[in-house]
Curated annotation (Swiss-Prot):
One of its GO terms (biological process) is transcription antitermination. It comes from Salinispora arenicola (strain CNS-205). The lineage of its organism: Bacteria, Bacillati, Actinomycetota, Actinomycetes, Micromonosporales. This is Transcription antitermination protein NusB. It comes from the Bacteria. GO terms for molecular function: RNA binding. The gene is nusB.
């Protein structure tokens, strides 16, 4: 598994746990990093950056996702999908070195592995529309 995909998976683990426990993502991240064996994985820095950035911009990310998820509220989305969308939208808006197509395809691939059968298509649609918005 490529390093950035591993980082996204780790970020997803932290965000998912924070979501389920209703805790701040950065607080869950601190416990997660503390539990990791040493030496720390090389991709950990990118995962930490994702979680910290998402925590800072969470309200804006959720607002965008909710506005483009036609017929769905954030609370109604599966937690995995909601958090994959947060990761991808953060990358679309704030991580210049990641191409939009890569951010979207990585989220879709993780959804294919970890969520419902409908999730990849659902995320691809939302993220594609948000990517169009982000490039205007």
């Amino acid at each position: 598994m490529p390093a950035r995909r591993k980082a996204r998976k780790r970020a997803l683990d932290v965000l998912f746990e924070a979501d389920l426990r209703d805790r701040p993502p950065v607080e869950v991240l601190a416990g997660y990093v503390e539990r990791l064996e040493k030496p720390r994985p090389e991709h950990l820095g990118y995962a930490v950056g994702l979680v910290e950035g998402i925590a800072v911009h969470l309200d804006r990310l959720d607002e965008l996702i909710a506005s483009y998820a036609e017929g769905w509220t954030l609370d109604r989305m599966p937690a995995v999908d909601r958090n994959l969308a947060r990761i991808a939208v953060y990358e679309l808006l704030y991580v210049d070195e990641i191409d939009d197509a890569v951010a979207i395809s990585e989220a879709v691939e993780l959804a294919r592995q970890m969520s419902t059968d409908d999730s990849p298509r659902f995320l691809n649609g939302i993220l594609g529309r948000i990517a169009e918005y982000a490039t205007r």
